Curated annotation (Swiss-Prot):
The chain crosses the membrane at residues 17-35. Ubiquitously expressed with a slightly higher expression in the liver and kidney. It comes from Mus musculus (Mouse). The gene is Spring1. This is SREBP regulating gene protein. One of its GO terms (cellular component) is Golgi membrane. Residues 36-205 are lumenal.
């Protein structure tokens, strides 16, 4: 019985109209799937745009200097640097020049405020601490607000917990998927800490 069915199927496949029918059905299925995927993508894109316009995320970020709930004589800082640290007032200092209250010692000549050393015009920097310090410049407020508005949907889970300018710069300057070309390769292996809107320029691997 199986041999008979196989024989009949082979004979059918030899006929051109059967092959044409199979090809036609396959083509229709392919086109239908492609159009459905495109419609779904357009619908999702429109939905995100509507959500952006009609339901803006209530960002908690405050850009006023000194808006921390901590005592005014205390500073938060970037903590992780082995050699450099940035405090919430935008000062960059060597770890040995960090005061007991968490602030950089501004009396030390090497301590600089709003320092953009090693930072490019696109907002990408060689060192994390300089990225945070440069990002804390009051003039960067409009850039950061624009980023928050444009990134509302894609990054809402990450940035909803951010409450002020300092926390935003700490989060923004950390290396992200925008900085990565491949899994273990940076787009720009030198200036990989970015506070700007655009990803680093793509360098050849």
């Amino acid at each position: 019985m199986l041999n008979l069915a196989a024989l009949l199927w082979r004979r059918l496949l030899r006929k051109r109209w059967v092959l044409a029918l199979v090809f036609g059905l396959s083509l229709v299925y392919f086109l239908s799937s492609t159009f459905k995927q495109e419609e779904r993508a357009v619908r999702d894109r429109n939905l995100l745009q509507v959500q952006d316009r009609e339901q803006p995320i209530p960002w908690k970020v405050q850009f006023n200097l000194g808006n921390s709930s901590r005592p005014s004589n205390q500073c938060r800082n970037s903590v992780q640097g082995k050699h450099l640290l940035t405090d919430e007032l935008g000062y960059v200092c060597e770890r040995k020049d960090l005061l007991a209250n968490g602030c950089c010692d501004v009396s030390v000549p090497s301590t600089k405020q709003y320092c953009c050393d090693g930072c490019l015009a696109n907002g990408c920097c060689e060192a994390y601490e300089y990225c945070v310090s440069c990002c804390l410049q009051p003039s960067k407020q409009l850039l950061l607000e624009r980023f928050l508005n444009r990134a509302a949907v894609a990054f809402q889970n990450l940035f909803m917990a951010v409450e002020d300018h300092f926390e935003l710069c700490l989060a923004k300057c950390r290396t992200s998927s925008q900085s990565v070309q491949h899994e273990n390769t940076y787009r720009d292996p030198i200036a990989k800490y970015c506070y700007g809107e655009s990803p680093p320029e793509l360098f050849p691997a």
